[in-house]
Amino acid sequence: MAKTKERKALKKGKAAFNLIGRVKVTDKTFNLDNSYDSGWTDNSMYVGVDCGNGNTVYAEMRSGFFPDKDNVIRAYSKDEKDDAGKSKSVEIAWEDRLDESLYDSISDSSFLTVGVEKDVKDKTVYKKFLTAYDAVEYLNEHLEDGMIVNVKGTIGYSEYEGNVSTKKEITSIVLSKIDDEADFKATFSQTILVDSKSIGKKNDDKGTMELVAYVIDYVGKPKIDGEKIEVKKNVTYPKTFEVAINENPEITAKMLQRFFKPKKGKITEITVTGNLVEGGSTVNITEDDIPDDIKELIEMGLYSEEEAEKKIAVGNGNRERRMIIVKPDITYVGTGDDRKPTVAFEDGKYDEDDLYFYEQALLDAGAE
């Protein structure tokens, strides 16, 4: 009897975003002390950042607790290591979460960072929070519409009825030192998997190539038909990206051939960087794009050329949520004098049979 090949464990890589722009605070941005039938109570923030040219990207913060239960916060120790050499996991009682005397022993990666106030010396005041529940409550008091902020966070993926959703969770929101809209941005860095058929069709209108790839994310205990199913594994999600075509198309063609086209049956891992586009276009509007009737308004002095171009940029936008890959990311390997830069790329890291999809993970966990 032939021996069944053991599936190689999937390793989650990078999944991060960075937004710089004007924050958009409305009466729907915050939802405090929202209660559910289960008793769960949470605070949430769903906020947009105008990153220029009508490109408003949304991200969120959310967490809560059960008022009638003993709630704990899981964090990581700053100094203690486990048997694998990783930061040791620690538990903090919910009622101790604001006790700053505990903070010195906790790893910086366990905190959410907020800096949206200035002191009397015009210096940004930074606050650390162990929970989004408290960070959102603070931001509700201090975050103001129109502030120029620098937002960082992680990108998460989930699947429901065959549709893959993307969620951007904020880990840091602080005042930005940038004040020129030309320097606003919405970028991401994401580890993806590609196979021999990932490269899709060219879209001349958008100036991009389709890339049908995969991402890896952790699934804990999803609720299926009202019951929690224990998966606790990294799983694969299909995800379609776009690849920006360079002004010199040969550069893009060479990049795709070198990094995005593994041998048949093999899966390549690569970390890429790119731009997030939501609700607007990142194209630059010039005088040639201004319609004649709007040019008349400029001639009358009712609009400046710059104002008109901004209006047109917004009007030309769409409500798609696009992740447009620009190039491979560069990472560093080694330590000390041996530390060196390298492309974050591993050709043929997995076989096609190693891909472990969400639906299969649910079946293996006992879901019907």
Regions found by a protein language model. Give the residues of each.
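OB-fold and OB-like single-stranded nucleic-acid-recognition modules
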Residues: M1-E368
